[in-house]
A protein has these predicted regions:
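Active-site cofactor/cluster-binding pocket
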Residues: 2-122
Length: 122
């Protein structure tokens, strides 16, 4: 999995000087890791810079450590909060297994930031 992790910063993925280009970010993890909170914080940061934002969360059995993921879209001319497969600029993964599950959303040359700490199912 190391070949999909790019050690560059995310500054070029979330460049606020060019909001004409949409940015698609998928955040994923398991219930209790703060995935939805992180999504809301990123959305609030973008909105504070007058960048249009759309987001959607999917929370499945979250209170029991179930899968949680958020789609966060920034930029102009957004018509849906959902990110199409193969179009995410960035995946932020709080749990490695959930990150692998979201890889189909990543576009070619997209970036992945992932925690190496796996959450064992109970």
């Amino acid at each position: 999995m190391n070949n999909i992790v790019n050690n560059t910063t995310t500054a070029n993925v979330i460049n606020t000087s060019d909001i004409a280009t949409n940015r698609n970010i998928v955040l994923c993890g398991v219930g209790g890791q703060g995935t939805v909170l992180a999504s809301k914080l990123l959305a609030a940061a973008a909105m504070s810079k007058d960048i249009p934002v759309m987001s959607a969360e999917t929370i499945g059995m979250a209170q029991r450590g179930g899968s949680v993921f958020s789609h966060l879209r920034m930029g102009k001319n957004l018509y849906s909060p959902m990110i199409k497969t193969g179009t995410a600029d960035l995946i932020i993964g709080f749990e490695p297994g959930e990150t692998v599950r979201m890889l189909p959303y990543l576009k070619e040359h997209g970036q992945v930031v992932v925690s190496t700490h796996a959450i064992k199912p109970v």
